[in-house]
Amino acid sequence: MLKDQNLDIERKQDHIEINLTQNVESTLKSGFESIHFIHNALPELNYDSINTTTTFLGKSLQAPILISSMTGGTTRARDINYRLAQVAQKAGIAMGLGSMRVLLTEPDTIKTFAVRHIAPDIPLLANIGAVQLNYGVTPKECQYLVDAIKADALILHLNVLQELTQPEGNRNWEKLLPKIREVVHYLSIPVIVKEVGYGLSKKVAESLIDAGVKVLDIAGSGGTSWSQVEAYRATNSLQNRIASSFINWGIPTLDSLKMVREVSKDIPIITSGGLKSGIDGAKAIRIGANIFGLAGQFLKAADTSESLLFEEIQLIIEQLKITMLCTGSRTLKDLAKAEIRL
């Protein structure tokens, strides 16, 4: 057990370091570069009237932005999560925590995840890999993770390709959907299912919605490639070559968003995966997202300072607001109907 615990911590340290120092982007594009808003030269709007507010999980957001799940479990991760939480609270946006599996075996790591005292008002998301349900994690333990950080929802992340290219990855993905359904019905709060950078297909979205999942985070291709992250962690050339061969794998984020929105007009969708700016976020809202998530650039900023992170989030919000004004969109509902060309 101790060996497994140490491996969890080591893996989390590796993931932070690799994401900060190596190029681990997918060679696929997110797809949003193919969408262009029709510029409105006479918007008849006052910038001060632009309204980016929305609601998510019953809470108000000042902008439709999620700091996507990144890390936890280590001292460096604690510092990063504290900065993320401080800035999320200040900016009025949502935040996801990194995988909390380590908390089930290392209770002391709670201090690296517990940020509710820093961010009392924002939607806060607990997180664990869905495949862990095939390796002994129970619905009761999922509720424990939620309670431990006073979360508003639980993310069950789907990372099959990452696990299969990871030296110590889990390989049994059989009969997982019934276990997801069981967690959905057991928990006192909503379950979000999230991909980690390869997208959700129409078929998978249909299955998850049927299982009672309340929110989908499509996390398509175009951003971080976790198989490429694992290529840097490989302990031999064969593992490296296997992982590296999947750098262009997945469903581009735009395609995944269209697929999932076709399945349901109503389910809340978080769009992440390769979004680089508030302009990309605006495009995601236009195509059908409720909120949009970013991770990589926030991680780099948060590893440096709270002020740099806040500037990065201000940049995203300002880009979003300018896009709204230049499309004649006073609200996010207006933005969802803005003119575009493909």
Curated annotation (Swiss-Prot):
EC number, UniProt record: 5.3.3.2
Cofactor: FMN; NADPH; Mg(2+)
GO molecular function: FMN binding; isopentenyl-diphosphate delta-isomerase activity; magnesium ion binding; NADPH binding; oxidoreductase activity
EC class of the enzyme, as a word: isomerase
GO process annotations (BP): isoprenoid biosynthetic process
Residues bound to substrate: 11-12, 99-101, 162
Magnesium keyword on record: yes
GO cellular component: cytoplasm
Keywords: Cytoplasm, Flavoprotein, FMN, Isomerase, Isoprene biosynthesis, Magnesium, Metal-binding, NADP
PANTHER family, A to Z: ISOPENTENYL-DIPHOSPHATE DELTA-ISOMERASE
Family designation: Belongs to the IPP isomerase type 2 family.
Physiological role: Involved in the biosynthesis of isoprenoids. Catalyzes the 1,3-allylic rearrangement of the homoallylic substrate isopentenyl (IPP) to its allylic isomer, dimethylallyl diphosphate (DMAPP).
Name listed for the protein in its UniProt record: Isopentenyl-diphosphate delta-isomerase
